[in-house]
From Swiss-Prot:
E.C. designation(s): 6.1.1.15
Domain of life: Bacteria
Subcellular location: Cytoplasm
Membership in a protein family: Belongs to the class-II aminoacyl-tRNA synthetase family. ProS type 1 subfamily.
Protein name stated in the entry: Proline--tRNA ligase
NCBIfam families cross-referenced by the UniProt entry: PRK09194.1, proS_fam_II
Listed GO CC annotations: cytosol
Species this chain originates from: Nocardioides sp. (strain ATCC BAA-499 / JS614)
InterPro entries: aa-tRNA-synt_IIb, aa-tRNA-synth_II, aa-tRNA-synth_II/BPL/LPL, Anticodon-bd, Anticodon-bd_dom_sf, Pro-tRNA-ligase_IIa, Pro-tRNA-synth_IIa_bac-type, Pro-tRNA-Synthase_IIa_type1
This protein's UniProt keywords: Aminoacyl-tRNA synthetase, ATP-binding, Cytoplasm, Ligase, Nucleotide-binding, Protein biosynthesis
């Protein structure tokens, strides 16, 4: 096919859009791939739609190759299936809800586990029907509170979601591995750097879960890698290596001390070193126990107070806490009104003595795993200007449970205990695969008869990829200072022909080259605009980012045509009579 710039519905921009936060957003708008319709909602222009469709086709080919079958569900979904799994409530404000004229409740589909489960339940009843893998590529909707970064965090997005159905866990393992292998092939073909990391299941439920992250400094996801082994995990899924209990038979008794004007860890440590110096080493923030209290609002309207106890040199990671609390839960640190309602909590001096579900304040108290039995701490004495020294975990206090929400830092030990340390990096979530198990099958009563004629609950896997997000992720990973630079597999065209000058022979030669390439199945973007300067055409070619640029211009008089590699910048002058063969060889290499 030949796309002509003179008639193509595109308008390139020289200035960055005012709301662009990341390079992919800026360049996709400037190059005429997408246009903003509303916050988090974008229109796909012809060039952008071509890239999106190519990504979808790569996904489709690899899904078909493992025997998955494509289908399509509606985007407008009834309330009842989501009530059965409790996700109508769990999603909270995160979904778009609406009613028809009769008052019946619906939602715009954020994900389709329930619908896939029900259609299989309607049609299949025997183990002989399984295993089964089915998928769709469809638009999803989520009411993001803060849509940002263009296509990376939107309210409307395209997603491929597939589901496997097996009669037992061994079958699920096989289906999961097939999908995982297919995802590796998909991301290898899409042409950007990625990493596979352990992940949390979140609202999806289930057990084993992995994410495919595009490496990107602008990514919203933080992940860690071990410096020695192959361990990699989303920061939300990182677990601290087990710490053995510390003997405390000889530990001194806990004692309260006056520590005026020390409501922060920094002021407390300074006071300790001034008033209670130690011979072996100075006091440090890691010697203190920080107790951070949150007001937690659940989607069903319930509110609770939650305290997290962690070493004073660590902060609570909001994303880790969000992942722990679940979909639709909103939280914020205790405010003045919250403290006023619980007078036993002394702001800046909160200690374990006032915390716990059975204490008067009724605050659920969860401890970081580093607060192991026998460890000694300095922490609040539940009175202004006072702290307790030598408070021993397990002897003097305990929590209602454990929670892993402290920030993960470079240099932390690898959870595998191999002596390696963790290093952090940023990425964009491109794919997420889950072993759902029987969560949705149980909720929706999906059962089949096994070989013995006994009803058994089907076990499921869920596998998602975001094609629209992939457009942005690829742009993030491959752009340069001049513009986009697409991998050939997903580029809107194979070749961008630029005819320069006003010579009719130049345009005639460019036209002939375009047709000859088209006959050979090469996709051509042809800049045939007669009244546009060469400089503007060159800038547009660099901005649009087609992988091979052919410049037909002044070299034609000498019998040569320039061929440029967009990603490397390498140029070569090719004899005009060999040009088509050379370009075809480049495209098909």
């Amino acid at each position: 096919m030949i796309m002509r710039m003179s008639s193509l519905f595109v308008r390139t921009l020289r200035e960055d859009p005012a709301d662009a936060e990341v390079p992919s957003h800026r360049l996709l708008v400037r190059a005429g791939y997408i246009r903003r319709a509303a916050p988090g909602i974008y229109t796909w222009l012809p060039l952008g739609l071509r890239v999106l469709r190519k990504i979808e086709n790569v996904i489709r080919e690899e899904m078909d190759a493992i025997g998955a079958q494509e289908m399509l569900f509606p985007a407008l979904l009834p309330r009842e299936p989501y009530e059965a799994t409790n996700r109508w409530t769990e999603y909270g404000d995160g979904i778009f809800r609406l009613q028809d004229r009769k008052g019946a409740d619906y939602l715009l589909g954020p994900t389709h586990e329930e619908m896939f489960t029900l259609v299989v339940k309607d049609l299949y009843s025997s183990y002989k029907d399984l295993p089964l893998s089915i998928y769709q590529i469809q638009t999803k909707y989520r009411d993001e509170a803060r849509p940002r970064a263009g296509l990376l965090r939107g309210r409307e997005f395209v997603m491929k979601d597939s589901y496997s159905f097996d009669v037992d866990d061994a079958g699920l393992d096989v289906s999961y591995q097939k999908h995982r292998d297919a995802y590796v092939r998909i991301f290898d073909r899409l042409g950007f750097e990625y990493v596979i990391v352990e992940a949390m299941s979140g609202a999806m439920g289930g057990s084993k879960s992995e994410e495919f992250l595009a490496k990107a400094s602008v990514g919203e996801d933080t992940y860690v890698r071990c410096t020695l082994c192959d361990y990699a995990a989303n920061v939300e899924a990182v677990h601290s290596p087990p710490i053995p209990p510390v003997p405390y038979d000889d530990a001194p008794a806990a004692h309260a001390e006056q520590t005026p004007d020390t409501p922060t860890i920094e002021t407390l440590v300074a006071h300790l070193n001034e008033r209670f110096p130690r011979e072996d080493r100075p006091w440090a923030a890691s010697d203190t126990l920080k107790n951070v209290v949150f007001s937690v609002h659940h989607p069903d309207g319930a509110t609770e107070a939650l305290a997290v106890g962690l070493p004073g040199d660590r902060e609570v990671d909001a994303k880790r806490l969000e992942a722990h609390l679940g979909e639709g839960v909103v939280f914020e640190p205790f405010g003045e009104a919250d403290f006023a309602a619980r007078p036993t909590l002394a702001k800046g001096y909160i200690g374990p003595g006032a915390l716990g579900e059975k204490k008067p304040a009724g605050v659920r108290y969860l401890l970081d795993p580093r607060v192991v039995e026998g460890t000694r701490w300095v922490t609040g004495a539940d009175a202004a200007g006072s702290h307790v020294i030598d408070l021993v975990a397990g002897r003097d206090f305990s929590g209602d449970g454990l929670i892993e929400v402290a920030e993960v830092r470079d240099g932390d030990p690898c959870p595998r205990g191999d002596g390696g340390t963790l290093e952090t990096a940023r990425g964009i979530e491109m794919g997420h695969i889950f072993q759902l198990g029987r969560k949705y099958a149980d909720a929706l009563d999906l059962k089949v008869l096994d070989e013995q004629g006994k009803l058994v609950t089907v076990t499921m896997g869920s596998y998602g990829i975001g094609p629209s997000r992939a457009v942005a992720a690829i742009a993030e990973g491959t752009h340069d200072e001049l513009g986009l630079a697409w991998p050939r597999e997903v580029a809107p065209a194979d070749v961008h022909i630029v005819a320069t000058g006003k010579d009719e022979h130049v345009f005639a030669a460019a036209e002939r080259i375009a047709h000859e390439l088209d006959k050979q199945g090469v996709e051509v973007l042809y800049d045939d605009r007669p009244k546009v300067s060469p400089g503007v055409k060159f800038k547009d070619a660099e901005l649009i980012g087609v992988p091979t640029i052919v410049v037909v211009g002044k070299g034609l008089a000498a019998g040569t045509i320039e061929v440029k590699d967009r990603r490397t910048g390498q140029r070569q002058d090719v004899p005009a009579d060999h040009l088509v063969d050379r370009v075809i060889a480049i495209v098909r290499a």
